[in-house]
A protein has these predicted regions:
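C-terminal domain-boundary segment and adjacent tail
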Residues: 113-154
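Metal-dependent polysaccharide deacetylase catalytic core of the NodB/CE4 family, i.e.
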Residues: 1-106, 110
Length: 154
């Protein structure tokens, strides 16, 4: 994590326990996020403020718990569906074909074919888009989120 952070990548919070946040209380969500934040901060020196729930499972309680504890809930807009036995070419097609300006692509580390196909995905996208951190991408205030999870400035 430290090497990734030191290369300029942003580290967010994806939970400590990987629990289904839609089935636990706001207090339990906050405690779980705090535990993860403490670990990230001990490694990077910076406490994350962005968070995404495990499996993308969220509801009003999850979003409010994040906001009430000074965090911002984020979600992805393109899913590479790279888990399980996903074939590299399928991951590539889903990731590249569906991506538009402002998208956040969901890919996982430790999956069967993601690491092998990632350079090809990056090469295809870097000629069309500028890669930025999530903090650089999102609006921090005066915004609305539509039913697809896309953020728009008011």
């Amino acid at each position: 994590m430290k090497k990734i952070y030191d290369r300029g990548h942003e580290i967010g919070n994806h939970s400590y326990s990987h629990a289904d946040y839609t089935k636990i209380s706001a207090e339990a969500i906050t405690a779980d996020l705090d535990k993860c934040d403490g670990i990230v901060e001990s490694i990077t020196g910076e406490r994350p403020y962005l968070m995404r729930a495990p499996s993308g499972g969220y509801n009003n309680t999850v979003v409010k718990a994040a906001e009430d504890s000074g965090r911002m809930y984020i979600q992805w807009s393109v899913d590479g569906i790279d888990y399980g036995d996903a074939e590299a070419q399928d991951i590539y097609e889903r990731s590249v074909r569906r991506t538009q300006n402002g998208d956040i692509i969901l890919l996982h580390n430790g999956t069967k074919n993601t690491a092998a196909i990632l350079p090809k995905i990056l090469e295809a996208l870097e000629c069309k888009y500028e890669f930025v951190t999530v903090s650089e991408l999102i609006y921090k205030d005066n915004y609305v989120i539509d039913n697809t999870g896309r953020q728009f400035q008011k």
